[in-house]
Amino acid sequence: MTGRKTAGKKAAGGLPEPAPAARQRFRRTLLRWYDRNGRDLPWRRTDDPYHILVSEIMLQQTQVDRVLPKYHEWLGKFPSFHALADAGEEAAVRTWYPLGYNIRPRRLHAIAREAVASYGGRLPDDEATLRSFKGIGPYTAGALMSFAFRRRAPILDTNVARVLFRVIVGRGDLKSHRMKRHLWKVSALMVPHRRAFDFNQAIMDFGALVCTARRPKCEGCPMSGMCRAYPFDPASGDAPR
């Protein structure tokens, strides 16, 4: 199978890592696809860290089409960290409705209060300090570094993990801690020095639109020639093999 050529070596744990040529091929293929098919979303038209944080917290466990109207409503009511911190936690929870998972607006409000109290209503632009905020984990910190501060930073949400697992690794337990650690390493290797912002947006879109969880569009997929899970078997899914 041609897809077996994607990985160039194995990491210390025995999991495949992409060789430099495979990384370049993956990047070119993904960015070419994104230039034609990428989604036009409002949080991609801003580098305001607050706006991007709001979108990232909302998108946790909630589909894009449900987030879009609430994102605009939220920013209309709470346009800044200062406005959110001043509004109070219960106002944030009420405005969040009906997105659910109400721990999210409470965390967002707590982040706003800390940003106002300690950083003048801004977010710091280094990953370690971002991760010191309660409610900002590795993915959200990476997303802020990439999308708000335009740094070359890896991300690993559900969509990104699925794409990298299928194309680069191909077998194993996607949900294991060992695999997640490995995929973070792969994500860091994959992010290019140029167009890092576009690359991270592209891989999320690719996972959402093509390399989906249950019924990926393998037929005609631009990654099929390098994908180690191609053709994907819906019966086995991403279970250990």
Could you tell me what each predicted segment is?
Residues 1-17, 238-239:
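Polybasic, lysine-enriched low-complexity intrinsically disordered terminal tails
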Residues 15-22, 28-29, 33-235:
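Catalytic cores of DNA base-excision repair glycosylases
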